């Protein structure tokens, strides 16, 4: 099941002249939503954090959205429709492009952005992924170094597309990028955390990678389980000496890792406690 709204209207086609198609000139957000029985409406997990990042990315890319309250209206409109046709939870993807324009990289001032909301079914991961962990690999593909774009979820995702084409093994959940300096960065679709001697480490996202919302949530709300949370460069060798590893994104939340290539890892009980936090609706900052 999929629904789409473009600029406030239910439709699923855009112009071939859209700069998002021609140049990747735009960005996207992906998050989860659910129907709240208590509130009697549909709510998005960590919505205010996603909305803040939308505003920050618009400012950085100089994409002019005149009225951000329209995003709230579009969100409500598409989720209400989704619930009316029987959905009680799912995935919400928001794509914002600079809009339609002529040839060439230079964009016109005051272009009208195209704002797309897409609702689709939630992917159900096996419960043993969360109790027993998943396998991951190290990518053979490089990740693009770009200090200016680091952290932003822009539409140029060919790094992940090429890396994801490297494996067909259904037992492998994701593949980790290594930069040109042999530092571990992130997965094709996830951020990365690892525990070493009671310290939680996550790679810095200063020259490449995405600063994911779930990465932010763990840093902000899970410090109680560790002596320290370090955001720093981490070599591949240092990472492979970790005591325990987990992945994050807005759909999987927290996913323990049991194996990297041929090396096996234990699942720290603190990771399981963090997973339990997501059962608390207040923790999800629903809005």
Language model regions located:
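Helix-start/capping segments and mature chain N-termini
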Residues: 1-66, 73-77, 102-287
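Ordered, amphipathic secondary-structure segments that act as subunit-interaction surfaces
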Residues: 79-96, 103
């Amino acid at each position: 099941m999929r629904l789409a709204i473009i600029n406030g209207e239910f439709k699923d086609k855009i112009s071939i002249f859209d700069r998002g198609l021609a140049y990747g000139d735009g960005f996207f957000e992906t998050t989860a939503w659910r129907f709240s029985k208590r509130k009697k409406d549909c709510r998005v997990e960590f919505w205010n954090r996603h909305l803040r990042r939308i505003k920050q990315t618009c400012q950085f890319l100089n994409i002019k959205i005149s009225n951000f309250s329209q995003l709230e209206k579009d969100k409500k409109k598409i989720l209400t429709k989704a619930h009316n046709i029987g959905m009680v939870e799912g995935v919400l993807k928001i794509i914002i492009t600079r809009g339609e324009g002529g040839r060439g990289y230079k964009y016109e001032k005051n272009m009208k952005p195209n704002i797309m909301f897409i609702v689709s079914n939630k992917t159900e991961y096996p419960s043993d992924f969360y109790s027993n962990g998943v396998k991951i690999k190290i990518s053979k593909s490089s990740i693009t170094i770009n200090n200016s774009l680091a952290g932003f979820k822009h539409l140029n995702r060919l790094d992940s597309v090429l890396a994801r084409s490297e494996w067909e093994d259904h037992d492998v959940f994701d593949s980790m990028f290594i930069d040109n300096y042999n530092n571990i960065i992130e997965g094709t679709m996830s951020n990365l955390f690892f525990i070493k001697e009671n310290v939680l480490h996550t790679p810095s996202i200063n020259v490449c990678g995405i600063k994911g919302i779930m990465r932010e949530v763990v840093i902000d709300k899970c410090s109680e389980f560790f002596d320290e949370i370090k955001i720093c460069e981490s070599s591949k060798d240092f990472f492979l000496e970790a005591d325990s590893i987990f992945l994050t994104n807005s759909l999987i939340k927290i996913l323990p890792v049991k194996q990297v290539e041929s090396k096996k890892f234990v699942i720290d009980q603190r990771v399981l406690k963090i997973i339990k936090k997501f059962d608390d609706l207040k923790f999800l900052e629903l809005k």
